[in-house]
Regions:
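Bacterial N-terminal signal peptides
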Residues: 7-16
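Sec/Tat signal peptide C-region and signal peptidase I cleavage site
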Residues: 17-23
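Acidic, low-complexity proline/glycine-rich segments
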Residues: 24-53
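Electrostatic cytochrome c docking/interface patches
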Residues: 39, 47-74, 85-99, 103-104, ...
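C-type cytochrome heme c attachment motif
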Residues: 74-85, 132-139, 152-161, 190, ...
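Acidic, glycine-rich loop-and-strand cores that form catalytic or ligand-binding grooves
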Residues: 151, 155-209
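Extended, hydrophilic extramembrane loops/domains of integral membrane proteins
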Residues: 214-257
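Juxtamembrane interface at the cytosolic side of transmembrane helices
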Residues: 263-294
Length: 294
């Protein structure tokens, strides 16, 4: 029996090492997939895998950096909100970013929302209040598509959880132990910073933009949205595309999972409870069966 178990474990270890070696051989040193594919072969998107970035909210003890979230809100407000909605995020939640009620109320008042009907049965517009949600920039999906090369920009409420690149074997096995859950922010950052010139011989359709990090194709309708110095920061943070991308990715992660910190604290306490409970069960078992004949 011991020999059989040892053989199974040896085969498992060999399979893991073999898969890792195969993955290393199949992927270039920079982590990018080949830009060209054999004729007739179906390309695998994204053409380049997103790089794992450093995030304050990563790991079992991760937490949101409020200063970064405030910068990300500024990037979203001044750049992204022109095309992308956040229909599921109410203004009142901005107090979790470190703003007081007066600041949240003033921020919401910068927007107008549709309300009604009034006593005359007509719809009307009014200034937003903290209980309102971020308004959409377009009246409907058709209007959004007509203004963006035929592709309606997705809502950003849950984009950090909805957009991610699948990690193959054996990476997804290791992710269980490293608690890697930042696929979405890594993808968003890679996409925003990944615009580049297409390789020789690659034809970009009219109205398209080459980005090897796009999850569905090599070309997308959205032009490069960020440039250095585009958004002014008041806290002295670098005003670069890389920093903008990290900040807005963090903000979108918060929008998608605002209770992340509470979830991680609860999970840690549950693990402590289970550890103590396991010890108590073991000691109880030893006490009960201490004088029993086996």
């Amino acid at each position: 029996m011991k020999t059989l178990v040892a053989s199974i474990l040896s085969l498992a270890v060999a399979a893991v090492l073999g898969s890792a070696a195969f993955a290393q051989e199949a992927t270039p040193a920079n982590g990018a997939a080949p830009a060209h594919h054999e004729e007739g072969a179906t390309p695998h998107y994204p053409l380049k895998e997103p790089k794992e970035e450093e995030w304050s909210f990563a790991g079992p003890f991760g937490h949101y950096d409020k200063a970064q979230l405030q910068r990300g809100l500024k990037v979203y407000t001044e750049v992204c909100s022109a095309c992308h909605s956040m229909n599921l995020v109410p203004f009142r939640m901005l107090d979790e970013l470190g703003y007081n009620q007066a600041q949240v109320k003033a921020f919401a008042a910068n927007y107008e929302v549709q309300d009604g009907p009034n006593a005359a049965g007509e719809m009307f517009t009014r200034k937003a209040v903290p209980s309102d949600h971020f308004p959409a920039p377009f009246a409907n999906a058709e209007a959004a598509a007509a203004s963006n090369n035929g592709a309606a920009p997705p809502d950003f409420s849950l984009i950090a959880k909805a957009r991610e690149v699948e990690r193959g074997f054996p990476q997804f096995v290791f992710d269980v132990f490293t608690q890697y859950q930042e696929n979405g922010p890594d993808y968003i950052h890679a996409l925003l910073t990944g615009y580049e010139e297409p390789p020789a011989g690659f034809q970009v359709p009219q109205g398209g933009h080459y980005n090897p990090y796009f999850h569905a194709a090599a070309v997308l309708a959205m032009p490069k949205p960020l440039s250095d110095g585009q958004v002014t920061y008041d806290d002295g943070a670098p005003q670069t595309v890389d920093q903008y991308s990290k900040d807005v990715s963090s903000f979108l992660m918060w929008a998608a999972e605002p209770h992340l910190e509470e979830r991680k604290r609860t999970g840690f306490m549950v693990m402590i409870f289970l550890a103590i409970f396991t010890v108590l069960i073991y000691l109880t078992k030893r006490s009960v069966y201490a004088n029993k004949d086996h």
